[in-house]
Amino acid sequence: MFLNTLIKTVLFKNKNLEAQSSEPLPTVHQQWNPATGGITMGMDPALKAKLQKQRYHIVGEHGGVKTCHWTKESLLRDRACYKGTFYGVKSHTCMQMSPVVDQCNLACTYCWREPHMDTLELTDQDPLELLYESVRAQRRLLSGFGGNDKVPREKFLEAQDPKHVAISLNGEPTLYTRLSEYMDLCHKHGMTTMLVTNGTLPKVLENLDTLPTQLYVSVDAPNKQVFDDVCRPKWNSGAWDQFEKTIDLLPSLDTRIVCRHTLMKGVNMSSTHIKEFAELDNRADPDFIEAKGYVYVGHSRENLSMENMPSHDDILSFSNELAPQVNREVLSESRPSRVALIGREIVPIPIPEAELYFPEDLGIAPPVKKLPLIQN
């Protein structure tokens, strides 16, 4: 009886989502979880196989960790991500993860990740388990660097206990119902949190008991028309209104705020767009603004073209035009990442004092047997 009721509840939820969408939703992937005595809504097996092929380490039912390009560069060649230049982040101590790698309420044209599941099953994985398993996964993904003569031993050992958690890998992390608890645990373990959100769930941000060390909001559209064309809400026609609520909420949040503009040539970089971006930025009053160029890679190649990829000079031109309109200046830039930092002054991100420590026997995640790719 309980199982039937739960299944009906889930299917009813998806039916409601389908009513808000112009496209039908696929079948929910259900599996019995003997540990909890209930049904778990698992990740789409085809998507999971693709993510594993791309070297994601899946954590729990919907979470995941993947080694950042700049983490590898820091270990092998002592090169730093632009976050190192802008905020003092040591790339080899940064863990890139998401509690929901497979779900998002938008389908942005510029997103280079694999398309997400077309269901929104909120995940409530235990936050301490998520943290421990993510660190174990990070150690597994970095394990091969330990035997590389090009990697300094000291840096490799430092990388085993991350100091920064970039909650930005894939999906929309504010769909994780225990996000606040997770970030609190990160801070208590002496780690910063850098949360990236699309800003369409303002109530989640408003109700967070623990805020991230640094909150990034993707401000990729200067107006509703561009938002609908570029960010492509899946179900909610009022997503732009929710996004504007987030913009107006940001000044009240007691944490570091970054508005990030992903720039696409011929899409959102005109002088008119810059003026509209400035209006949004002035309402948000962030500590920093990042102007970052779209890169023609991955799934985004199905939506955009090489011509939409701005040069670094294009990024600087945009930034130099925007900065005076928001009473800020261009503080720094990174040509390899095609990004410029706009703000009033550079202030390194503060690392919290550790109150808790990882268990000595935390260890490393075991190798994962990857799922075979499923041909559509």
Language-model features: where?
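Flexible, acidic/Gly-rich N-terminal and inter-domain linker regions that tether
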Residues: 2-110, 114-119, 123-136, 140, ...
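Hydrophobic, Leu/Ile/Phe/Ala-enriched alpha-helical segments that form helix-helix packing faces
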Residues: 134, 138, 142, 247-250, ...
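Short, solvent-exposed linear motifs at loop/edge-of-secondary-structure regions
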Residues: 89-105, 283-293, 315-321
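Short Gly/Ser/Thr- and Asp/Glu-enriched loop/turn motifs at secondary-structure junctions
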Residues: 92, 160-162, 334-338
